[in-house]
Regions:
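C-terminal segment of classical bacterial N-terminal signal peptides
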Residues: 18-27
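Active-site-adjacent loops and short helices of periplasmic peptidoglycan-processing enzymes
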Residues: 27-204, 208-222, 279
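Domain-terminus/edge residues, biased toward the C-terminal soluble/receptor-binding domains
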Residues: 183-184, 197-200, 204-205, 210-490
């Protein structure tokens, strides 16, 4: 293109002038500097600890030269491979995944992005660019292709100005969005990833960002394009083709199931790479930080083979038996000790675990965590809606707890416990349960979930009834469930009572027999 020709000639001229102005001694000194052997450093890193390899029963992952690396299963968030996943490292152009995600969320694909002089000339000379001139404009869709396929830095800057108003304000948006995704090891200072000491991330954080990015099919399609033809318009007069340097995307390395990815490189970060692939319904995200070319691609292939070959993704509701998740409503809240105003709970159907193929689901460690404040808020809101005659929950499903699964101490997935929001039976029971009462305040209602019970100002008899109600209760589908610890306690108490009764009756029988014997002796003496 003409603009490239002009810039090329200008670059040569500037380089010649700079060279002619530099003292010879400086150049001589630079040539004598000892060069860093990055490949030797990468080779040494292959002996570093791989944290996931220390998990008991976990498949042993490969030794790679990357400083930081992670393999994450997208649906469950399970980390299958971990090497320094929380270490602060420089991301380079994989930063653009976050910029692209924000653009997709904040802008319309048809919006126009006009490029200012600041956007065009703020980037480093010689860095990735498509040669946009100040005043020209692209659609957001074209900009995203330029961002992800050609890694165009001036396009990243233009998108940042479009969203944030200026390059200085946009990093606040980046850091806020990263935090919302659960990132705790990152700090972003620019939209493109050009080097800044305060611009860093971790393998784990980049996996979280990529996980969200590749959850959007349109974004995944853009990031999986080997080429893109940029059409001319009245705002951008040139036609040209963009080429993707990601070898698993452009076909240089063939690999089944690639969904997209992003390359990155600056001198201080070395090679960085993010890639997403899916096979048999299992989506894996691989992040490589600080590696040497072409091993960032070789590492990725090796980790994908490791993940797809050794792990399986399981839907929790297909395997969980301990919490009777196959039956909806395995938990409930009661308006009173008689069970009136029962409110159904269920377990989310979109929860997954990802575990080694050699480990059975039944062997996993599970832990139920409740949000007590949220549960009580749900009860109060629901009862108030029921008493007002509403039969539909205003806010739909509400998460009031979570079941966490792990292999030892290593998390492998979770699922939410939901309040279903079905008030059809609540309204009827509420009317019956509050008839004749002076107050309908929900604050005094007992709350039951799991093995935790709450009640206020109840009589001893009421307490006994409430205890029995807690042991035997039914789900929304009518299935009966037992609280095993409480049932065992009840059996012990019942056994003790039975023993006492037997002893008492035995003693009474002994006394009666003794009286009979005395009467017989007296009667016999009289007869004699």
């Amino acid at each position: 293109m003409k603009r490239f020709g002009k810039r090329f000639l200008l670059s040569i001229l500037c380089g010649f002038l700079i060279f002619s102005m530099c003292p010879v001694s400086v150049w001589a000194a630079e040539e004598t500097d000892e060069e860093v052997d990055y490949y030797a450093e990468a080779e040494e890193r292959k002996s570093e600890e791989i944290q996931s390899n220390s998990i008991a029963g976990w498949p042993q992952g490969p030794a790679i030269g990357a400083e930081g690396a992670i393999l994450m299963e997208a649906d469950s968030g399970t980390v299958l491979y971990a090497k320094n996943i929380h270490e602060h490292l420089y991301p380079a152009s994989i930063t653009k995944l976050l910029t692209g995600l924000l653009a997709y969320e904040k802008l319309s694909m048809d919006d126009m992005v006009e490029f200012s002089e600041t956007a065009v000339f703020s980037i480093e000379f010689g860095s990735s660019s498509i040669g946009i001139d100040p005043g020209e404009a692209l659609t957001v869709e074209q900009s995203l292709y330029a961002l992800m396929v050609a890694s165009a830095n001036e396009v990243a800057a233009g998108l940042a100005e479009k969203m944030g108003g200026s390059l200085d304000k946009f990093p606040d948006m980046m850091n806020s969005r990263a935090e919302s995704l659960g990132c705790t090891d990152s700090h972003f200072t620019n939209p493109h990833g050009l080097f800044n000491e305060e611009h860093y991330t971790s393998a784990y954080d980049m996996a979280l960002i990529a996980r969200e990015y590749f959850s959007h099919e349109e974004l995944a399609k853009i990031a999986n394009s080997p080429t893109y033809f940029m059409e001319s318009s009245d705002r951008q007069p040139e036609e040209f083709t963009l080429f993707n340097k990601h070898k698993l995307i452009n076909g240089e390395i063939e690999y089944e199931g690639i969904l997209g990815g992003k390359t990155g490189f600056v001198e201080m970060s070395r090679q960085t790479l993010v890639t997403c692939a899916e096979r048999n319904g299992m989506k894996l995200i691989c992040v490589i930080l600080r590696e040497e070319s072409p091993d960032q691609f070789n590492d990725t292939v090796e980790l994908f083979d490791y993940g797809f070959g050794n792990f399986q993704k399981l839907k929790i509701t297909d395997y969980e038996k301990k919490y009777t998740i196959n039956n909806p409503g395995f938990m409930r809240l009661g308006k009173d000790i008689y069970g009136n105003n029962s409110i159904p709970f269920t377990v989310s159907g979109d929860g997954y675990v990802c575990i080694p193929k050699e480990i059975a689901f039944d062997s996993l460690t599970s832990e139920v965590k409740y949000d007590d404040a949220k549960a009580e808020e749900v009860v109060k809101t629901t009862v108030e809606e029921a008493e007002a005659g509403s039969t539909e929950a205003s806010s739909g499903n509400k998460v009031i707890g979570t079941i966490h699964y792990s292999v030892g101490d290593w998390p492998v997935g979770k699922t939410n416990i939901l309040f279903t929001g079905d008030l059809s039976s609540v309204a009827m029971d509420s009317a019956e349960g509050t008839a004749g009462s002076e107050s309908g305040d929900a604050s005094g209602e007992p709350v039951q979930y799991g093995t935790a019970h709450y009640s206020e100002n109840k009589s001893f008899v009421d307490g006994i009834k409430y205890f029995f109600k807690g042991i035997f209760h039914s789900g929304a589908n009518g299935t009966m469930y037992l609280d095993v610890p409480a049932l065992l306690f009840l059996v012990i108490i019942a056994s003790a009572v039975l023993i006492v009764v037997i002893v008492i009756f035995s003693y009474i029988r002994y006394l009666n027999n003794r009286r009979r014997r005395r009467r017989r002796r007296k009667k016999k003496k009289k007869q004699e």
